[in-house]
Amino acid sequence: MGQEYLLQVQNVTKQYGEKIALNDFSMDICQGEIVALIGENGAVKTTLLNIICGYSKPSAGQVQYKGKNIVANPLITREFGVLIEPQFLDYISAEENLRLLSQLTNQKQDTRIKELLEKTELYSSLKKKVKEFSFGMKQRLGLCQCLLTEVGFLILDEPFVGLDPIGKELFKQTILDMAHKQNVPVLFSSHDLDDVDEICDRVVMISKGNKQLDQPLEHKQTYTVKIECTIFD
């Protein structure tokens, strides 16, 4: 029996006027798999993540989650934990931001909020207004937001940028725990190949809107050569 894919990106194209930003892109992700999306600035990694999350519609092709087209079934993306430019109310505390989000999702999450703030080492700052947070603290609070409800698929855009070494390790361990302990697939974009090498199972590379590589991490030498050829082409 073949692998069952939880998420399928099928021949997705994104076009703005006459400009093709993303060209006929396909990718499949299995349960419990950690996939890194890499590429240079302007490689439309975030564009692809926005399409997968249902924030932007593809010009052609489709994204399926659990066999359902997310454009036709937008409510299914409620199972996604997403960290793409997290949004906060800066004038209230970290705790209040999470409580407000839990009210919007109609779930009482007092215990979960405490667990997440402790896990991300923000508990000592739970009463502090978000406007007083550093960038790294806001990233960690964003992680709390996307894990507040039960997550079936985790999507992170450049999660390690701006983090100190402790923050990086915290994010990496969270990703590993989600995939290996809860069998939740994780898709994250990154520029840092060291971070990619450390935690992911598979590398997918985009360059100039086209998929250039889709390879298991065990073939590291092959994908490193491919990256170098693409960068210096």
Regions found by a protein language model. Name each.
Residues 53:
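Helix-to-loop junction immediately C-terminal to a conserved catalytic motif
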Residues 38-40:
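The feature captures the beta-strand-to-loop junction immediately N-terminal to the Walker
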Residues 61-76:
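Conserved ABC transporter NBD signature motif
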Residues 172-233:
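ABC transporter nucleotide-binding domain
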Residues 99, 110-125:
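Conserved ABC ATPase "signature" region
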Residues 154-158:
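Catalytic Walker B motif of ABC-type/P-loop ATPase nucleotide-binding domains
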